[in-house]
From Swiss-Prot:
Protein name in the entry: Calmodulin-like protein 5
Gene: CML5
Induction (UniProt): By touch and during darkness conditions.
Organismal lineage: Eukaryota, Viridiplantae, Streptophyta, Embryophyta, Tracheophyta
Extent of the signal sequence: none
Keyword annotations of the record: Calcium, Metal-binding, Repeat
Organism: Arabidopsis thaliana
Amino acid sequence: MVRIFLLYNILNSFLLSLVPKKLRTLFPLSWFDKTLHKNSPPSPSTMLPSPSSSSAPTKRIDPSELKRVFQMFDKNGDGRITKEELNDSLENLGIYIPDKDLTQMIHKIDANGDGCVDIDEFESLYSSIVDEHHNDGETEEEDMKDAFNVFDQDGDGFITVEELKSVMASLGLKQGKTLDGCKKMIMQVDADGDGRVNYKEFLQMMKGGGFSSSN
């Protein structure tokens, strides 16, 4: 199955959190794999696991974690993800999917048939993907490498201020909109003072809780 996952970041105070491969849905591998074309996502049938096909989750989902991820899609905060909101989120990442395919994606998750995805339906999907992650044998080290590669957009082994800003903007996040704000975040974890974050610094940052800001 095509590997799909979602990174989300920024908690209450510029805190970067990672959900490694927990949301293998909606976002094709092509967004992360620089050798592929961003605008050629796989079909919805290969992108979305079916929540009903999974057994009951063995891991308790953190409600606050679930809510943060859900709110990234629920732009107007009404408790439902519409097709339009899904489309906007994908377009923010440079991913363009035909209207009929978006409808199929919503339909696959939409248990009550109202044409939207509510928090309960999202939790069912999220739980099945978390369960799959815990059973697929992948390691935290692999997750960290995948995450670093998303931020390291040019593949040079460093996360720059510009790259951090680009990723945050593509995820539609409000925090860190300015280069100055992102520069302060980089400085928090830039141990060698070169203005960039290398993989070692990235690992140390993740162990410490994430990018933080005194603002």
